Amino acid sequence: MTKQIQKTVSVCIIGRPNSGKSTLLNRIIGEKLSIVTPKVQTTRSIITGIITLNDTQIILYDTPGIFEPKGTLEKAMVRCAWSSLHSADIVMLIIDSLKPLDSITHDILNKLRSLNVVPVFLLNKIDVESKYIDDTKAFLAENYSDSLLFPISAISGENVDKLLEYITSKAKIAPWLYEEDDITDLPMRFIAAEITREQLFLGLQQELPYKLTVQTEKWEELKDKSVKINQIIVVSRESYKTIILGKNGSKIKELGAKSRMQMQQFFGFPVHLFLFVKVRELWEDNSDYYEYMKI
């Protein structure tokens, strides 16, 4: 029997916050792996997505949005995004076509040039009419003629098939790094924490979601094939804890129920989820939390 020739290619997706990086990764692998919310800076670490198409395994790195960081956590997130370039065969810069090119995007372009990186441009959100798209295309064509440009819609899937054809064409003969049906190399504990953090981002107002982190403290497989999960929501102030708990614990019950449903849908087995809130002042300056968050 002839052994199948295996090919691999790795791709990192960088860009400003809320430009569509996580949505694109989820679209390509066909699963909701990377959490998505309307709030900026939802992604804090590199999320690895994997898809195997025929003889080619594609490894995708979704990264934190690049912006002007202020605090210790934000600086760590931006460093994490830039570090992904070293692991990738292809660097893709995703640009929101609904917005004009701003100073941060120009800074990203300049840094890529200083690193001698020729990115592939993804002009995202073309499913919505934009008054900026023609100017953006003209600027990129004039100043970055060596780069390819793909107008896409990560949310509708428009032109994503053409993008995949290009990515596949760049694969090199090499053994696959993962099993054929793997979609990520992230631990289930980490994914579960991300699912809960997504619900906190969606369910809490203003700045509070940025002031917390989630850790899966316990993962116990039970005899009936269900899993008991204990998670800690870490906040820096007692007032934040009060908000998350809600009146008579109503808010945390609501958030827990939504998180549990998402976990069951993703993992495919029953989940018993227990959430606890702990106050840890200045947790954002503690590197132990960064290690758990993979940044």
Swiss-Prot record:
Its main location: cytoplasm. Residues 124-127 are annotated as: G4. One of its GO terms (cellular component) is cytosol. Residues 62-65 are annotated as: G3. Keywords: Cell inner membrane, Cell membrane, Cytoplasm, GTP-binding, Membrane, Nucleotide-binding, Ribosome biogenesis, RNA-binding, rRNA-binding. It is a peripheral membrane protein. It is found in: Cytoplasm; Cell inner membrane. The keyword GTP-binding applies. Residues 7-176 form the Era-type G domain. One of its GO terms (biological process) is ribosomal small subunit assembly. Residues 15-22 are annotated as: G1. Residues 152-154 are annotated as: G5. It comes from the Bacteria. GO terms for molecular function: GTP binding; GTPase activity; ribosomal small subunit binding; small ribosomal subunit rRNA binding. Monomer. An essential GTPase that binds both GDP and GTP, with rapid nucleotide exchange. Plays a role in 16S rRNA processing and 30S ribosomal subunit biogenesis and possibly also in cell cycle regulation and energy metabolism. This is GTPase Era. It comes from Rickettsia bellii (strain OSU 85-389). The lineage of its organism: Bacteria, Pseudomonadati, Pseudomonadota, Alphaproteobacteria, Rickettsiales. The gene is era.
